[in-house]
Amino acid sequence: MERIKELRDLMSQSRTREILTKTTVDHMAIIKKYTSGRQEKNPALRMKWMMAMKYPITADKRIIEMIPERNEQGQTLWSKTNDAGSDRVMVSPLAVTWWNRNGPTTSAVHYPKVYKTYFEKVERLKHGTFGPVHFRNQVKIRRRVDINPGHADLSAKEAQDVIMEVVFPNEVGARILTSESQLTITKEKKEELQDCKIAPLMVAYMLERELVRKTRFLPVAGGTSSVYIEVLHLTQGTCWEQMYTPGGEVRNDDVDQSLIIAARNIVRRATVSADPLASLLEMCHSTQIGGIRMVDILRQNPTEEQAVDICKAAMGLRISSSFSFGGFTFKRTSGSSVKKEEEVLTGNLQTLKIRVHEGYEEFTMVGRRATAILRKATRRLIQLIVSGRDEQSIAEAIIVAMVFSQEDCMIKAVRGDLNFVNRANQRLNPMHQLLRHFQKDAKVLFQNWGIEPIDNVMGMIGILPDMTPSTEMSLRGVRVSKMGVDEYSSTERVVVSIDRFLRVRDQRGNVLLSPEEVSETQGTEKLTITYSSSMMWEINGPESVLVNTYQWIIRNWETVKIQWSQDPTMLYNKMEFEPFQSLVPKAARGQYSGFVRTLFQQMRDVLGTFDTVQIIKLLPFAAAPPEQSRMQFSSLTVNVRGSGMRILVRGNSPVFNYNKATKRLTVLGKDAGALTEDPDEGTAGVESAVLRGFLILGKEDKRYGPALSINELSNLAKGEKANVLIGQGDVVLVMKRKRDSS
């Protein structure tokens, strides 16, 4: 109080006021503090002080020609004195108002294109629905989220090249536009921004927003896709949340979502094939998501999900060093361990060989609906702090942590035999056996774990074996917390290796991921996923297998035709016929195959024309291992549309219908393509029939001279073509086989 009184007295003297307002500041340290560097030290004060002046703005000299000296109210708009530090004019804020009202206008056509992301955001908010506000404790955990809806997924370098090419095409400097997306975007943007008058720098900034994914590590409870993150400040506070439904979707969220679905489908399918790794790569390379190659998306998209990471590992890309177990992402935050093989006995006296982690370690566990901190020693859980959305989610996290701890009481809690298998009918490894067992029923596990009295700690409560909360007792070492555990924030990626069974290991040999970790959740993709690989035909059901098999034969007819006559065994073993076998009744597969192969052999041996259409129709049936029998069939059954449908050996049926006039094939009413004529070989196809040692190429071709009789054919050299008279006066073009075949 004394000091304030003293100041009041000082201020009442006019000399004090004069010193404070009139004298110059000449202390070097102060001058340095406020004048060094370009960064404004006190922006708010500077703004107030500038705006109090009459002419706080400077403008280019040309402005005098374009703006009157006074406005309609007679207020001066610019000063006749030049700005001291430059050759610019001093201008009043009123000049800006005048310019905005009366200045020259320019075409607005480019604004929505350049500021596309803003215009789209306004639309999303306009059509979004805001629901009621709920007050409750928010369990937020920091996750790495995409904060920029509506972007492509280019790397910073790729985007930089595109921006330079679009905005500053005449600047020097090497720019390499290689990826498909780079080229498409560049072409599209150049067309959109022709004659654009918006400042190039602004255009460049806005393009960057459109091309590059920007992520931040933010506390989130609820939706993490970018259309939710853009309204984070409106939807969740410390103790409240507001319901919100976005008024539109953006492609980048759709890509992320569809990528996860495609990757899961591919990993699941690869697991059951003979060589999972080769199959997985074949499928990744032949799949498109929303019209873009999946491998291109994998290279650019930072989504971390088990199946996506397995695909990335297979492609030799780096992935996060965290590992996955029971659907939770584990990240070791301290400690270390060595792994030793140990044999343990379950409660059912079954012997399990497990890899025991010896040593003290701490982990964070992050799942979709629950998070936890786990401290463990060798085969012992020391402490588990869990938080989650609901009882169910918390229980899931506790089970995973208990199994991961490898404690003896967990192994002894097993009742019954462990014989869980994966999709390929292979036994799961022991840790996943235990996990599946307790995920089905954890009652015994929780009952046998043991409970302990607990201290009263802020923000923590206990949880009982029946998963009810308690302030007195809790499962041994387990506590439930109100606070979530943050996701691992680092974006560091490590080099990994993958074996043919799709197990992903880091360079120390620790397993980070395996197909067992891939979620079984089925979703509907937002973007069209096109699987070109025959391995994925069955994903859309039996009809799709049928149509795709015949489409494949027709598309590849030229090569199929030659193999059919020269190397049928190789043809029958093609993987494209694998999915078809699941449609043929098990009991009939071998008989059908034997029947069709015999029929085909007769066609190769016996004189006379034969119908391409029939070969195409019956070919898929010949792929199964044949049974030798004298059985004859007039129709073959396939299981589609929930029942057996017949394909007639001779003639059309609803399943397989060939229209001679249009040369088009329909399978189950869907168009399966046309039998095209081969320009080199007349009508290779429709009349293709076979003489022993000769391939019939099609109708007569006058270029090869008059028709020979069958006896004269023996004079032809291998590979030579000739017209020949067969059957009922038909003349066809044949070629002597290059090699003999039965």
UniProtKB/Swiss-Prot annotation:
It comes from the Viruses. A motif (Nuclear localization signal) lies at residues 736-739. GO terms for biological process: 7-methylguanosine mRNA capping; cap snatching; DNA-templated transcription; symbiont-mediated suppression of host cytoplasmic pattern recognition receptor signaling pathway via inhibition of MAVS activity; symbiont-mediated suppression of host gene expression; symbiont-mediated suppression of host mRNA transcription via inhibition of RNA polymerase II activity. The keyword rRNA-binding does not apply. Its main location: virion. This is Polymerase basic protein 2. Plays an essential role in transcription initiation and cap-stealing mechanism, in which cellular capped pre-mRNAs are used to generate primers for viral transcription. Binds the cap of the target pre-RNA which is subsequently cleaved after 10-13 nucleotides by PA. Plays a role in the initiation of the viral genome replication and modulates the activity of the ribonucleoprotein (RNP) complex. In addition, participates in the inhibition of type I interferon induction through interaction with the host mitochondrial antiviral signaling protein MAVS. Keywords: Cap snatching, Eukaryotic host gene expression shutoff by virus, Eukaryotic host transcription shutoff by virus, Host gene expression shutoff by virus, Host mitochondrion, Host nucleus, Host-virus interaction, Inhibition of host innate immune response by virus, Inhibition of host MAVS by virus, Inhibition of host RLR pathway by virus, Inhibition of host RNA polymerase II by virus, mRNA capping, mRNA processing, Viral immunoevasion, Viral transcription, Virion. Belongs to the influenza viruses PB2 family. Influenza RNA polymerase is composed of three subunits: PB1, PB2 and PA. Interacts (via N-terminus) with PB1 (via C-terminus). Interacts with nucleoprotein NP (via N-terminus). Interacts (via N-terminus) with host MAVS (via N-terminus); this interaction inhibits host innate immune response. GO terms for molecular function: RNA binding. It comes from Influenza A virus (strain A/Chicken/Hong Kong/715.5/2001 H5N1 genotype E). One of its GO terms (cellular component) is host cell nucleus. It is found in: Virion; Host nucleus; Host mitochondrion. It holds the Pfam family Flu_PB2_7th. The keyword Metal-binding does not apply. InterPro entries: Flu_PB2_2nd, Flu_PB2_6th, Flu_PB2_C, Flu_PB2_CAP-bd, Flu_PB2_middle, Flu_PB2_N, PB2_helical, PDB2_C.
